[in-house]
């Protein structure tokens, strides 16, 4: 029988805010007696756009934009009810998307 585990996936456009959130989650889990695996960095997703600067002609003048989405995975293998309670009460910075899944 597999042991239950919690997988937390974090996404953000700013890697500094993302790493700060990951650090906060790991400290909370360790403080409440849980065992953490990670953070596992996933590949950065880059999206690029090319836009004409002029509304009518002059195709040679273009502007390029890029946005990068950073993501990390944290696995919590052993946890207590206090760990889950502490995770629910964490205040993460704005701009960090969190997905939580229970497995096992």
Swiss-Prot record:
PROSITE patterns: RIBOSOMAL_S10
One biological process term in Gene Ontology: translation
One matching Pfam family: Ribosomal_S10
Organism domain of life: Bacteria
Name of the encoding gene: rpsJ
Described function: Involved in the binding of tRNA to the ribosomes.
Keyword list, A-Z: Ribonucleoprotein, Ribosomal protein
Keyword Ribosomal protein listed: yes
A Gene Ontology cellular-component term: ribonucleoprotein complex
Quaternary assembly: Part of the 30S ribosomal subunit.
Matching Gene3D superfamilies: Ribosomal protein S10 domain
Gene Ontology molecular function: structural constituent of ribosome; tRNA binding
Family affiliation: Belongs to the universal ribosomal protein uS10 family.
The name this protein goes by in its record: Small ribosomal subunit protein uS10
